UniProtKB/Swiss-Prot annotation:
Belongs to the methyltransferase superfamily. METTL23 family. It is found in: Nucleus; Cytoplasm. This is Histone-arginine methyltransferase METTL23. Keywords: Chromatin regulator, Cytoplasm, Methyltransferase, Nucleus, S-adenosyl-L-methionine, Transferase. Its EC number is 2.1.1.319. Histone methyltransferase that dimethylates histone H3 at 'Arg-17', forming asymmetric dimethylarginine (H3R17me2a), leading to activate transcription via chromatin remodeling.
């Protein structure tokens, strides 16, 4: 109780809308944000864009086995769960505060039965080995520190070895023209397809009733196994 007060936990509501003819569909997600310096404790622009992609494709999520990596406050994972996916949330085993915030997000949205596990990128841990086959891996802004890029892709590749049809849906914020994962994709026999934001109604500065992503340059890509060893496409 005292710790939560010290952390100054706030709430932010995201409301996703979709009009199809005269029919309007709506979904609300409430996210707890801990107002401190740890960047995994509040919503970043990439998370809203990835959540918008999930919302746009919500009809394809029912009963899909979904793992969110580097979940932080879990906006995409929570939305996927509310759309009927079988979700597992994960963040670094070395960041228990983020894991607790994943649980807090579930509780705040009345979601039960969603496992929250510690996964450290690049490590083949017991929790990683115990995961069931995964259909979709989610990751928003996980390509944040270049030193982590290969560990992220190593973890993704390990999961895809067990489920070759799996896809890694990820958004990232363009911070430097010098940063690229292309060589690493080739190394780990992966390929990616860029998804234009306009194709899922994410090409504006304000999504889900928020002020995000703002003017940040966010890109969306889908990473899969490259069976031909061709590397990067799209």
């Amino acid at each position: 109780m005292g710790e939560e007060n010290e952390q100054r936990i706030g709430e932010r509501v995201y409301e996703f809308l979709r009009r199809e003819g005269k029919d309007e569909q709506k979904m609300r997600v409430t996210i707890p944000e801990v107002l401190n310096c740890q960047y995994g404790m509040y919503v970043w622009p990439c998370a809203v864009v990835l959540a918008q992609y999930l919302w746009y494709h919500r009809k394809n999520l029912a009963d899909k086995r979904v793992l969110e990596v580097g979940a932080g406050v879990s906006l995409p994972g929570i939305l996927a769960a509310k759309c009927g996916a079988k979700v597992i949330l994960s963040d670094s085993a070395e960041m228990p505060q983020c894991l607790e915030n994943c649980r807090r997000s579930c509780k705040m949205n009345n979601i039960v039965g969603v496992p929250v596990i510690g996964l450290t990128w690049g490590e083949v841990s017991p929790d990683l080995l115990d995961l069931p086959p995964i259909d979709i891996i989610l990751g928003s802004d996980v390509f944040y520190e270049p030193k982590d890029f290969e560990d992220i892709l190593l973890t993704v590749r390990f999961l895809m070895e067990r489920m070759p049809q799996a896809e890694f849906w990820t958004t990232y914020q363009v911070r430097s023209a010098d940063w690229s994962v292309e060589a690493l994709l080739c190394k780990w026999n992966l390929k990616c397809t860029n998804v234009p934001l306009k194709t899922f109604d994410a090409d504006n500065e304000c999504l889900a009733g928020s002020e995000l992503p703002g003017r940040h340059t966010v890109q969306m890509m889908i990473i899969t196994l490259d069976r031909k060893g061709a590397g990067h496409t799209g």
